Amino acid sequence: MRLKGEKAEICYEETKEFFKKRACKYNPENPYSVTMYQDEHKELVTERNRKEIEILYPWLGIGKSSRILDVACGIGRWADAVQEDIDLYYGIDFCSELVDIANKRNKRPNFHFFSCDLDHVAREMNGHKFNLVLMIGIIVYINDVELNGVLNSIESLCEEHATVCVREPIASDQRLTLKRYYSEELKDDYNAIYRSKEELIGAFETTFLAKGFHIAEERALFEEADLNNRKETHQHYFILKR
């Protein structure tokens, strides 16, 4: 089902089952396709990953004092990008099968991967606070009714001075919801909520921005047409700082 301009909820259990099946398709030859899709286009996955990191990394200020919370870490794609010596990295994902892969791929002693639902994230951190939060492609799977609560919970884990990096697929025009929509590309039913840029900024205004953050930068991630191969959606990023 494709719903354009309408609000509808998606099923978390179906999304979790989708990613469980994605984990079964993990291929060391094309590891990032598990969460970036494009199973048959390794070159596109590689180039999108390279370009995303090239654009976003300079905004993150990663160094020895960095304490990173990677929300929806998947198999640890962004953990791979962090080559500096840092203080702490916590990667969380609601799919335990993806977390298992992340733990096998990354053995650095101060990098930790956990499986937990987003509504439990604050209590799972054992009092840890973070100065960098990565939210890469997660809001698209969160229903409206839970979104503000999730964002406020993540804000509560931020240090006084912190950066939040949000990279999301968003609707180029009006909201698009895919609900149990069969994808020929993925060979599976898919659920996602592609919000407009204005909707996301509205969610930030009542959460992060209300707690002292400001939007330091926001724009479309890819300018290249071959990296934007969707007509109704595109990748967009927001850099929030406090």
Question: Residue locations for each model-derived region?
Answer:
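Class I (Rossmann-like) S-adenosyl-L-methionine-dependent methyltransferase catalytic domain
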Residues: 1-64, 71, 75-125, 142-149, ...
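A conserved beta-strand element that flanks and buttresses the S-adenosyl-L-methionine
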Residues: 134
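Short catalytic micro-motifs in class I SAM-dependent methyltransferases
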Residues: 137-141
